[in-house]
Regions:
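Bacterial N-terminal signal peptides that target proteins for export
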Residues: 6-17
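Acidic, glycine-anchored loop motifs typical of Ca2+
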Residues: 83, 124-133, 139
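Solvent-exposed serine/threonine-rich low-complexity stretches and specific carbohydrate-binding patches
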Residues: 85-98
């Protein structure tokens, strides 16, 4: 009887810990699944036309960029074969709506075939200054533009 009592006491102590562990594992799994569902591309209200991008030295021209609200067209570099969203090499201000023949100068220069990410950022505080200051581990003040789980952006090669 004494052994059964000890086992029951241990079970009562371990049961909530096991439940908590299962809950934490389920939450981590849901976060991983949610993060893996994020994609890049165009949306219904925000888009970047990447077909036919032209280049004049280090300046690129996009025929059409649509943004719902004022914001920025931003270019992030690839480094060691992967995009580096922690820095940017070009930005240009966009007004709400359709913007035609958008030019953006890449400060570091361009090499034909070089990969980069072109994406939209919202001018959150409407000051016409790209506030590329991290507010947490992943997001800058002028946040990336999303439609649902689609981040409005593209990985493209320099022409």
């Amino acid at each position: 009887m004494a052994i059964e009592g000890i086992i029951m006491n241990q079970y009562r102590v371990l049961k909530p810990l096991i439940a908590l562990l299962l809950l934490v594992c389920a939450h981590a799994s849901a976060q991983t699944q949610q993060a893996s569902q994020i994609s890049i591309g165009n949306g219904e209200n925000n888009w970047i036309t990447v077909e036919g991008v032209t280049r004049n030295q280090s300046t690129l021209t996009f025929s059409e960029v649509q943004i719902d609200g004022n914001g920025w067209l931003v270019i992030h570099p690839f480094e060691d074969g992967a995009p580096n969203g922690d820095k940017y090499v070009a930005s240009t201000y966009l007004e709400d709506g359709k913007n035609l023949d958008v030019t953006i100068k890449v400060h570091k220069g361009l090499v034909s075939g070089e990969m980069f990410i072109v994406m939209l950022h919202r001018d959150v505080n409407e000051n016409k200054v790209l506030d590329f200051v991290f507010v947490d581990e992943q997001n800058v003040m002028d946040t990336a533009v999303f439609e649902g789980s689609t981040m409005i952006g593209h990985a493209i090669a320099a022409p």
